[in-house]
């Protein structure tokens, strides 16, 4: 028992989120009639404390606890920190949106916290068992959150699609894990790696099938082509506050799962999984960018944009070097912050009975709220990869990692798709600044929301001007 509880302190961020979720659930049940937003405040405090602990742990020793089920290292601490930050932003931006539409606010925060707990377990998983446990704990609350607006038929349809596709993906992943366990008799990722190295020649067909099934499951969670079919429909059909949540932190956790499995469990058959990742990365960047160009509805546009960004993150994984893995980690952390800002504007502007649905709803935003338009301009520039925003460095590091391993042709293709992608981001900027507004009313989002949103967007500029600290943290995470 003492051995099991030794070094349990490294799981403090998860414990804080679990306690917070339970407190938010009970307080919403018993005290909601006295203080409507009590679950919101408890959730925010818990997330901030969890983020602070994760930040303090960065740079500490790597530890394996709970009989090697759970790993504590810089990769997990960085991911947990950014998961907490993006979940906090999602909660803050969504508060007024949920209240106005009289949606069950307590349910949203509690489900969000349990999903966050799943994400944190997922990025610290060192066993196939913990990987699957974390994945399901992350996914199941997301299905319920998508259908949280019970009277909305679009949301119910989106939730059903999400659930059915998610169940198929989970089944494929579980089947892949069962094949690995059947072939090796091991669940710990290092033990799996050793068994694969020894038995690959004799059981290569079985391992190949397992790898394909597992990568298919991971591809679904990332919304990478050809497992992306659910993303545009779910992003469009779900309430904007839920789309905001789905588009940020779960992407970090899903890439964390991919990195754990590929860089530890399947490290000896890197050349085999590179072929699958190559196809997924190329198709994601290509199809994501090309289909985003023709979209007129903003949530669908950002869904295809998300698919293309996942493709770029997979380029880093494809490089199969410590620099490539660090670039992929850096990319997904920054993407989550950018996505929180982009969907944050949609949620914050969807007030007073108005729902931001079409790109045309942003027409003339510069005349209606110049500061908000400037913040969104920073987000669009960062997503397009325009210096001095941080989006430039994310793409630069990923493409440099490809060049370093002599995949220059792939870096050129990635650069070409970046140019195509810039078109639809700049189209939004053009609409905000040069088109006449259809509604002349001033856009007001409240002082608190303006401050938080400004910090979110200005961080993209700050990290672009001073990128060194975060890049160094990502490189050190894989160097160790």
From Swiss-Prot:
Reaction catalysis annotation: a quinone + NADH + 5 H(+)(in) = a quinol + NAD(+) + 4 H(+)(out)
E.C. number(s) listed in UniProt: 7.1.1.-
A molecular-function term among this protein's GO annotations: NADH dehydrogenase (ubiquinone) activity
Annotated transmembrane regions: 11-31, 38-58, 69-89, 109-129, 163-183, 207-227, 252-272, 276-296, 301-321, 329-349, 373-393, 401-421, 458-478
GO biological process, one term: ATP synthesis coupled electron transport
Function: NDH-1 shuttles electrons from NADH, via FMN and iron-sulfur (Fe-S) centers, to quinones in the respiratory chain. The immediate electron acceptor for the enzyme in this species is believed to be ubiquinone. Couples the redox reaction to proton translocation (for every two electrons transferred, four hydrogen ions are translocated across the cytoplasmic membrane), and thus conserves the redox energy in a proton gradient.
Subunit structure: NDH-1 is composed of 14 different subunits. Subunits NuoA, H, J, K, L, M, N constitute the membrane sector of the complex.
Family: Belongs to the complex I subunit 2 family.
HAMAP family, per database record: NDH1_NuoN_1
Record's protein name: NADH-quinone oxidoreductase subunit N
The species this protein was found in: Legionella pneumophila (strain Lens)
